[in-house]
């Protein structure tokens, strides 16, 4: 078996999150070395004086590797790139995590983006969060019409209509309208299963596999519109935010990203619901964002792809996971080379400043190219002083040109109906 089953470990016990966040802000001393030597409290192996020493806050600890290894700068990719996962706009109204309405906020315009795209060899940016209705029309006019072929825009669900009794029909009609005006596909944020409720922001959570969404999936299949879906989040976001959570610092910076507790479905249950949708709609093409939020468990996402030929994945915001398991990741790329898409989850400044692993810029793309094209060792996966998703570094997978061409360009061009 290419990807042998991996057993998950026992879940850790709950530690009071509020205490931990307070400790983080105050400067927690729980990581101090053990004190030996009886009543004096002095470590007998410590010979240097401790007078004048001071504690170092974890957030200020920014070590630099002493490894002397090759450093390869890849300024342009081996082949033109279609970045299938960028956010150049966002719905202006958000209620409890649910994007609503037709008003849009724009993060950049073509005049700002095209020079970067030319420098970094990017043929096309796909703006996943293009909105609905009049907002979608405005987004397409702002990007796709101004620079044809350089931008493609996707539509989103019209969740403001969810409370209507005939929502399934209205949603299908909204997607048909989006297709007529040029939307390249449908994008779903992690709204389903985690944010959308029966009363939009009140009542029970609405499951990913709720039958009311069936016409939405079926309409996309009929129109050959790929569905780019984000379900769940990294597994660590569903575990206690304690001293054993490897993404503790990230969750401390973004406590709203934690979904640990009985009020939320488990990581496993969310992905099982997603897989049921995929199985029920074999004619619909699903692109699972962020390696399906299973980049930490490539054996499981590989099993999903084996069972469902209508599944593709993108690698956006997950080279941090792929790059710390380079041998297994390379086998994954080799096995599914026709079904993996290049994406970054890029967000322009200043909106992306808080998520450096997504901050649109030259350095972000060069890191991705270095990961994919070289066998460099132990380098940063994001342009940040402290690794934002976890304190580790990554290794390049050094893919051959025949795979790079598909990953960078051809797979996305085929799904989006673009010229080769």
Stretch-by-stretch model annotation:
Residues 85, 117, 178, 186, ...:
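Conserved, mostly hydrophobic/aromatic
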Residues 90-93, 102-108, 127-138, 160-170, ...:
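Acidic-and-aromatic substrate-binding clefts and catalytic sites of carbohydrate-active enzymes
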Residues 57-65, 107, 262, 267-276, ...:
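H/E-rich (His + Asp/Glu) clusters that bind or coordinate divalent metals
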Residues 45-146, 169, 411:
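An N-terminally biased module of ancient metal coordination in phosphate/nucleic-acid-related enzymes
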Residues 20-21, 34:
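Short glycine-rich, low-complexity segments
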Residues 57-58, 63-65, 136-258, 309:
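Active-site gating/metal-coordination segments in enzymes
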Residues 82-86, 125-127, 152-155, 186-188, ...:
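Hydrophobic faces of well-ordered beta-strands that scaffold small-molecule active sites
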Residues 28-31:
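Cysteine-centered motifs
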């Amino acid at each position: 078996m290419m990807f042998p089953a991996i057993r998950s470990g026992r879940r850790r016990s709950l530690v009071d999150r509020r205490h931990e966040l307070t400790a983080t802000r105050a400067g927690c001393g729980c990581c101090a070395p053990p004190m030996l030597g009886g009543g004096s409290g002095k470590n007998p192996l410590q010979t240097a004086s401790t007078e004048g020493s001071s504690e170092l806050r974890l957030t200020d600890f920014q070590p630099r590797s002493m490894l002397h290894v090759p450093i390869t700068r890849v300024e342009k990719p081996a082949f033109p790139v279609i970045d299938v996962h960028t956010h150049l706009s966002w719905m202006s109204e958000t209620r409890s995590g649910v994007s609503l309405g037709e008003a849009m906020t724009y993060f950049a315009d073509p005049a700002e983006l095209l020079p970067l795209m030319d420098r970094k060899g990017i043929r096309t940016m796909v703006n996943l969060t293009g909105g609905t209705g009049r907002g979608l029309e405005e987004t397409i006019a702002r990007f796709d019409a101004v620079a044809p072929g350089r931008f493609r825009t996707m539509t989103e669900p019209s969740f403001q209509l969810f409370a209507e009794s005939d929502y399934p029909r209205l949603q299908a009609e909204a997607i048909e309208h989006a297709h007529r005006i040029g939307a390249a596909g449908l994008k779903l944020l992690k709204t389903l299963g985690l944010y959308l409720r029966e009363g939009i922001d009140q009542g029970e959570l609405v499951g990913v596999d709720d039958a009311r969404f069936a016409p939405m999936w079926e309409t996309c299949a009929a129109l050959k519109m790929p569905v780019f879906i984000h379900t769940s989040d990294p597994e660590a976001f569903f575990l206690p935010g304690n001293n054993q959570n490897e993404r503790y610092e990230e969750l401390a910076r973004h406590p709203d990203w934690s979904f640990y507790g009985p009020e939320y479905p488990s990581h496993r249950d969310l992905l099982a619901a997603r897989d049921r949708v995929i199985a029920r709609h074999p004619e619909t093409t699903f692109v699972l964002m962020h390696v399906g939020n299973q980049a930490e468990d490539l054996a499981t996402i590989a099993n999903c792809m084996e069972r469902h030929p209508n599944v593709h994945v993108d690698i956006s915001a997950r080279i941090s996971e792929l790059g710390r398991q380079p041998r297994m990741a390379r086998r994954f790329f080799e096995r599914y080379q026709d079904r993996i898409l290049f994406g970054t989850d890029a967000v322009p400044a200043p909106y992306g400043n808080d998520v450096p692993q997504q901050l649109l810029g030259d350095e972000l793309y060069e890191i991705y190219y270095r990961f994919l094209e070289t066998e460099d060792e132990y380098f940063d996966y994001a342009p940040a002083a402290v690794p934002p998703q976890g304190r580790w570094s990554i290794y390049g997978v050094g893919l051959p040109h025949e795979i790079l061409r598909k990953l960078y360009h051809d797979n996305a061009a085929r799904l989006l109906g673009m010229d080769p």
